[in-house]
Amino acid sequence: MEKMSHDPIAADIGTQVSDNALHGVTAGSTALTSVTGLVPAGADEVSAQAATAFTSEGIQLLASNASAQDQLHRAGEAVQDVARTYSQIDDGAAGVFA
């Protein structure tokens, strides 16, 4: 039978994934200002339509990015929870043998 174990570094990896996701959300929020603040290149109708299309597409991509960052954050928290559970069980089992 194979021994089950985990590497305690998993909690650190989960924390890093969660932190990276939070940085991604911050970057998306910063980009929102640039995406929504685009001024048409000229006074013509084509420039106005291009600016509107750019803004619309940018907002959709940033919403998708925010959703992805949320999922990454949840995944990082799940890894942290698993590592915490393993540590608690290992500590409890070690107490039985001590």
UniProtKB/Swiss-Prot annotation:
Record's subcellular location: Secreted; Cell surface
Coiled coil: none
Domain PE: 1-90
Pfam families reported in the protein's UniProt record: PE
Tree of life domain: Bacteria
Cellular component, GO annotation: cell surface; extracellular region
SUPFAM superfamilies: PE/PPE dimer-like
Secreted keyword on record: yes
Major subcellular location class: secreted
Keyword annotations of the record: Secreted, Virulence
InterPro entries for the chain: PE-PGRS_N
Protein purpose: Plays a major role in RD1-associated pathogenesis, and may contribute to the establishment and maintenance of M.tuberculosis infection. Together with PPE68, stimulates the secretion of IL-10 and MCP-1 from human macrophages, via the interaction with human Toll-like receptor 2 (TLR2).
Family indicated by similarity: Belongs to the mycobacterial PE family.
Subunit structure: Interacts with PPE68. PE35/PPE68 complex interacts with human TLR2.
Protein name (database record): PE family immunomodulator PE35
Organism, scientific name: Mycobacterium tuberculosis (strain CDC 1551 / Oshkosh)
